[in-house]
Structures are given as C-alpha cells and as structure tokens.
Amino acid sequence: MRSSVYVGRVGGLAVALGVGVAVATGYGCGQAWADTSGASGESSSESASTTTSDSTAAEQPKGSETTASPSPESTASEAPTSVVVSTGGANTSSESKDDEPATKPTKPAKKPKPKAKVSAPTTKVDDAEAKVDTGSRAAVDTSEQAKPASSFAAQTMSAATDLSTAAVTTLNVPSLRPWPTAYDPTTVVTYVGGLVSSVVKAVLDPFAAGAPAGPAQPLTVWTLLAWVRRELFNGTPTTHPVINSQSNGLVTGNLGAVDPDGDPLTYTVVGTPHNGGTVEVDQNGNFTYRPMNAMLAVGGTDQFTVVVSDESAGLHVHGPLGLAKFVPILGNFLNPGGGDAVAQTVVVNIDPQAGVDLSFPANFHWGVAHAGFQAEGGPGSPIDPNSDWYKWVHDPINQLLGLTHGVPENGPGTYVQYDSDAGLAHDALGMNTFRMSIEWSRIFPNSTASVDVSDEGGGVSLADLQALDALANQDEVQHYRDVFTSLRAHDLEPLITVNHFTLPSWVHDPTTTRLLAQLGLPAQDAGWLSSDTPVEFQKYAAYVAWKYGDQVDNWTVLNEPVPPVLTEFLAIPTVVPSWPPGLIRPDLASTFLVNEAKGYVAAYDEMHKWDTTVATAGQPAAFVGFANNMIPARPANPVNPNDVQAADAWNAFYNRWFPNAVINGWVDANLDGIQTPDELHPEMANKVDFMGVQYYGSQPMQGFGVAPIPGFPWLKGLPVRCAASDPTCSDFNQPTDPGGLREVLDIAASYKLADGTTQVPIWITENGIADANDSKRPSYIVNHIAVVQDEIAHGMDIRGYTYWSFVDNLEWANGYDLEFGLYGSDPTTPELERTPKPASISAISSITKDVNHSLPLSVLAMYIPGAV
C-alpha cells in the first residue's frame, strides 16, 4: 500500500472521507463501528506510564506503585552479561494484566483443552527483566494523576474473556444484508454515528487529564496570577540526555527531562530501538538499554525514542498555540499535541564484549520460499488458467488501466526447475527447509461442490476423500508428490502452504464479482465472501493432508489472511494495489475475514485428522499453523495524538485479529475492537500448533483523528512511505528496521497454547527485502537474523527462519519490478538460468553453514551498524 506516496495527510483524509461518504450513501457497510481509541491521544498507546516531577528526577516518589527497574548504578553493576532487561514487550498496544481473560476458556467437547490465553505485558522487574510495550508507544505509569490507559487496544481487552462459559452462537457477521454482497440499510446510520462519536471524543480529549491543580501557596493576588500564568502559559518539558558508561553489557543513563513548571512527567518509549536492542525507562527518566547479542559481540550503535509529557498534570495550555488542542481533530494538525510533549531520540554506542552467546539450536529450520502462482510459471511450465489470479492479471481492463503489471508466463518456471532449485537451496545456500505452496486450482480445476460432507456432521470422511480423488487432476497430484520427493532427496524439509492467496476460478470469478459486488448484487463465485467457500476449502485441505501426509509434516494452512482486506476491498487505483476482485467495498472485509477464519479452523481439524504419518522422525505427523503478516505501526509524529491513535488502531487490528480469532476464540466480527459475548467462540479457539511470522518492515502512520471509512474502524490514518534511495528503505518504499522484527516477535510470543502458559511456537515463514541492486539485502539479512538469535537466546521458542524469496518472481499486481530473490532468473534461456546475487548469498550461507550453528563474528563485523 503506497497511500502516502500519492496523497498527504489532509489530502488522504479528504480521499478517505470521500470514499466513506460514497460507501455510506450507496456503497455502504452494515457493520456497526466505533471509535475506541483512548480518552486522550497522548495515552492511547501507553500500556502503563512512568510519571514523576522534575523536582524529584533523581528519587522515586513515595507511595509509588511502580515496579520499574533499579537505579542505573545498581542495574549496571548487578546485571549479568546479556541479561534481558527488556524484551520489547508482548503487545502492540495498551493491554495490561488487568485486561487478561479472567479464566481460561475450554476447547469444544470434541477435543477438550484449556483455553489459550494471551500474556499481557508487565511493568514488574523480575530478575532484571521488564517487558516494554511494543506498540506505537510504550510506557509505565505510576502517578495517581496520570490518565488511565484507554486506547483502542486497551478497550478491546477490557472485558474478561471466559470461553468456558460462553454460549455457543452461530458465527456470522452482524448485518441486515439479504445476501453477502448486498448493501446494508443501516450503513448511513452507523457511518454518521461513528463520525459523530469520533468528533465528540476529540472534543472531550483535552479534558481527560482532569482539572488543573490549584495554587500550591496561600491564595493571594500574586499566587493567583502566577497560577493563571502557569496554567495558560505552561512550558513544554525539555530533555538533556546523559549516558553513563557501559557495564556488563548494559548502557544506562537518564533522559535529563525538566519541566519548567514542576509538572509530573510521563515517559513513553516509541516502538523498540531501531537496530534490535531493548530499552526500559523508569518513572524518573532513567533508562537501561540492552543491545542484541550480535551487537554486543562486535560493538555498534543503536537508537531509541522516548516521548516526555506533562499532560498528566491536569488541564493546562501551552501558550496561544496551545489553544489548538481545543479544536477537535484539526487542532492536532495545527499544533500536534498542544505543546504537552517532546520526543527525544537517544543514540547509544556499544563496545564489543567477549564471550557472548551467538548460537542457534542445532535443529533450527533454515529455509527459503516461493509460492505457486508467483514462481511456477515460465517457459516450459504448463499454464494453469483456472485460478482467480490468472484471470485477474490477464483481464484486458486491468491491463489497460495499469492495475496489473505482469503475467506468470514470464516467471522463473519453478514448476520445471524444482529439482535444480532444491539443489541450489541445499548446496549453495545451506538450507535444510524449503517453503512452497500447492495450487488449489491445479489439484481441483473444477468444482468439488458435488462432494457432500454434511452427512458426516460437517467432517470429511474417507468416502468423501475417495470422491474428491476421482475429481482431482491426477497429473498435478503426482507433480507435487514428485516435488516433495525431490526436496527430501536434497535433505530439505518441506514446509507446505495449503493456500497462498490464489483460489480456483470456480470458487472466485474475480471479474464477474467485481461488477456484481460493487453494485451490491448477488455474486455466486465470490471467493471468501461466499458462504460455501469455507466448506470447499475444508475438503481441499483434508485431501492434501490425506495425499501428502507421508511426505509433509509442517503445514501453513493460510498465507497472510489479513492484508487482502485492503487490496481487495479498498482497491483505490494509484493508491492501493488492486487484487481480485478489486472492489471499493470496505464493508465486505469482515465477511471475508470471518469466512477465512471458519475455513482455517475446519482445515486445521481435517489436517490433524488425515495426516497421521510422521514423515521425518522426531517430528509430529502434522504441525499446523498459519502465516501472519505483521507490520508494527509507529506514529509518524510521536507527540501527535492523531498519529498515535492511528498506529494503535492499526496494530490492534492488523497484527492481532486473526490470532485472536483462531487462538483465543475471539472473532471480532464487526472489526470494532470491542469484545462482546456473541464474539466469543470456544469452537474456534486453540486451532494452532505454531504461528508463522512474516515481517518485511515497519510503518509510520499519519493520523486523521477519525476512522472515516465505514467497515474500517481500525484505519485512522495512512502509512508514510520512504524513498527507495534511503539506506533503510526497500524498493517497495517500506522502512526496514530490525527492531520492528523484535516488536512483532514479541507480539506473537504473547499467545499461548491450550495449557494457557506455553508460548505458541513461532516460525518466521517470510522475511526479506526488495533490493534490485543487492546492496541493502546482505545487511538486512544479517541484522534480522541477529534479532532472531537474540530472542532465542533469551527464551523465545522460534523454530525456523525462512528468507523470501529463493528467486525473483511475480509480486502479484506489482509485477516483476520488485526483486526479493537470492537468485534472479532469465526466462529467455531454455534452462531458466538462475543468476546468483553473491553478496546476499555469501551473507546468509555463512550463517546457515556455520559448523558451530552460530553467527560468525566476521559477518557481524561487516554488517552490524557501527561495528568496531
């Protein structure tokens, strides 16, 4: 999504409001939506806050409830080498222990299990470890005067979740639609109501901090005048950071924050340190920074940003410009934050230290990846014309309008080159795992609706599988068996994606759906909008588990279930890439997501039912999960409440919606972020053996102050794209920072298995960068793998790392211009020649081939920023 490349903040709001009005008045959404951001933009990302007065900056206030870290001196002298002082936090927003489910819900009777629970972050330091929120803002609040955290995410988890007592309700999207693609008559009401509630909240926000404190001295004319001056011409805090010397692998210091009026201050960490470290800030502005192990081993530099605010002191105004805070929404465009806060970036330099743990588990899964539609096509490869994406990229209208930029026939031809590719992956790259996908439309080019599974209580029987076998294209079934055989012959473990976006055209006819659904008419083959698609997907998943269970143990059922809600249902030309069916119908996104979740859960159960053969000794017969694309959003301006709210809302929805649904059983069907009893579904919970994390970069957000698009209550701003010429920007115009990977890994690690305590295992199923010159990729690979190593060294259960991609391929609507591969490909040569990218291959293979299963110091010295 490249929205901010084309439109600025105000222009973006105008575009969004225009889309919203159009949708509401005839192209609308039936879902109720609500602005659930906090009472104040300043607090909206705060999991907790650290509050102090500048007059007591060196001592902890009496009666404080904080459990922040010890003083810098004691921390530096007592913490052991590489001790975890902060793991970056487990949440993307302001969840706390009080927000956790009160009891552990149970699994449905079919497979009784205790309910999985999400671990909330804590501010308590235990054995020198403290979690810091990894959302757009993170802080610790101990002042009784401080505002209560009431962000979008805080409210989503404020109600106790108890699936064991939740009534079993039918999982549907609430609406008055007569058919799935119809317009809902309540659209105008919900749209206008949502805008009004956003404006009302914005009006009340400045008063959320409470009344100002009265004069401290006996009341006289002079003290009254001084008090008036203090409240109307309040000074903004200033910062003068002081950094102490490094000790035991830790860097301590103080932000040196002073409030000219003696107001208590709150300290809020924005995201995580850029280059992969962790930081904690206490109530006095003392910070403790820990570098990732790789940086500690060779030295380097990192930076983090902290927002210092005096807003918790109560209502006050920072001079004439400060009055802008009383202008709803627009005030933060004129004077962001009203002068209450200042953002301070601290740069830390790390001296190298010997004896640092740089190891990986000996059985760690090192892999590369590609996907069927993106890579199979090319000279000599049989064409598959039966998928929605094939129809989409060949559609004359799309080609004429420039909505698509490539066809699979010009691809790298992995369909025919699979054996030599497997050899390169193992021998040249040092991999032991290969991730790839099966194309549903190749296995079943025609409908499987004739196979009725309703007579088995909704499950797939052996007779059903045999009937499906009769409908399958046996040549293609054998082809994938041959591919898996080749992978194993090259000592590569298959990691197989059951569905990587594409659908058979009998499930989804994109061009017909585009016309009918945009007009609100019934569309029969509407993909995940159709109510029968989850059942058809269930059959397909059961079939591939039955057919390939003896060759495959590790299954990724769905690839990135959330991103298509933007590219498919807010496909504004030149603003958002157009994916089939290319609608501007954001109101349909919830139907899409709910049906995906239904299909995933049914597939999960079927794959465990039909894959009972262990293909690799020591592994479970079926290790089943999903691949979650995760983008940590940060406020473009950390002191602007609009930006903070936009980042919070994005993080709570984009990174958490799907795991909340299939791990916790909370299916937020109207996407409003507010948990209600009818959204709790025990039958959906605990359907995961691992979570795939897919991370490419972070995302600064410019906020609107409202959610202007009906159906998208979580979209309160637009992302800021970077220039590809910047050293930390990809060719996809996305900022790249290793700290963002830590952020999303901590989110993923906060989810628990059915026992409520064991972390859901993580598999990094995609990580990569579009880099045509291969100049940024080597450093990107090394630094992101270094974050993975650091997380493992400090206790996180991560099973593997997969680089995307093995070879340059068709990047969906963007065509072939974005080059992610470790190899290029020349489709004009008969052998589809693979062109190696030496610097990147050298960097990654030096790690994967290391005989000690460790990060080589020589490679770290080349690529860690500022290495000595």
Give each language-model segment a name.
Residues 355-470:
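N-terminal structural segment of carbohydrate-active enzymes
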Residues 356-363, 367-391, 477-478, 485-775, ...:
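Active-site region of glycoside hydrolase catalytic domains
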Residues 255-257, 271-350:
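Acidic, turn/loop-rich segments in luminal/extracellular domains of secretory-pathway
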Residues 408-420, 469-479, 529-542:
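Glycine-rich anion/phosphate-binding loops
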Residues 258-266:
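Extracellular acidic loop/turn motifs
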Residues 246-252:
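Short coil/turn motif common to extracellular beta-sandwich-like domains
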Residues 418-503, 590, 596-608, 622:
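Aromatic-lined substrate-binding rim segments of carbohydrate-active enzymes
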Residues 1-236, 240, 250, 313-349, ...:
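Composition-driven, intrinsically disordered low-complexity tracts enriched in small residues
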